[in-house]
């Protein structure tokens, strides 16, 4: 974002705005950051950059709470993963457990046997 330092935030792309939001939050040096749909509307190339930054910050001790419907992103970023449906927690586990649990499959795909 260095080359865009003087650009008004409203002129940035969706992905650039997400990176700017993350940078603004980091100024306060938080220990926990909530990300609500961090990849929504973001160019896939910038999603990769965003993921790299999140992983790097997590390794430095920053905790992230991620609300996301993109399961590929969730699987790559989060451990543990908590799955909610209709406002209720239905599962907590690692990516493999979440991926194969019938309650999760039913919550997101419906009864596939029907």
Label every model-predicted segment.
Residues 8-12:
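Conserved ABC ATPase signature
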Residues 29:
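Conserved catalytic motifs of ABC-family nucleotide-binding domains
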Residues 33-37:
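Catalytic Walker B motif of ABC-type/P-loop ATPase nucleotide-binding domains
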Residues 47-60:
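Helical segment within the ABC ATPase nucleotide-binding domain
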Residues 68-69:
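H-loop/switch region of ABC-family ATPase nucleotide-binding domains
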Residues 74-76:
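A short, surface-exposed alpha-helical micro-motif characterized by mixed small hydrophobic
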């Amino acid at each position: 974002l260095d080359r865009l330092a003087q650009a008004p935030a409203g002129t940035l792309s969706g992905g650039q705005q997400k990176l700017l939001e993350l940078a603004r939050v980091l100024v306060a040096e938080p220990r926990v950051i909530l990300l609500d749909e961090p990849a929504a509307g973001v160019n896939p190339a910038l999603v990769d950059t965003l993921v790299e930054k999140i992983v790097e910050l997590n390794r430095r001790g920053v905790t992230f709470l991620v609300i996301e419907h993109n399961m590929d992103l969730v699987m790559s970023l989060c451990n543990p993963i908590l799955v909610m449906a209709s406002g209720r927690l239905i599962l907590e586990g690692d990516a493999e457990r979440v991926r194969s649990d019938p309650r999760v499959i039913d919550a997101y795909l419906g009864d596939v046997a029907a």
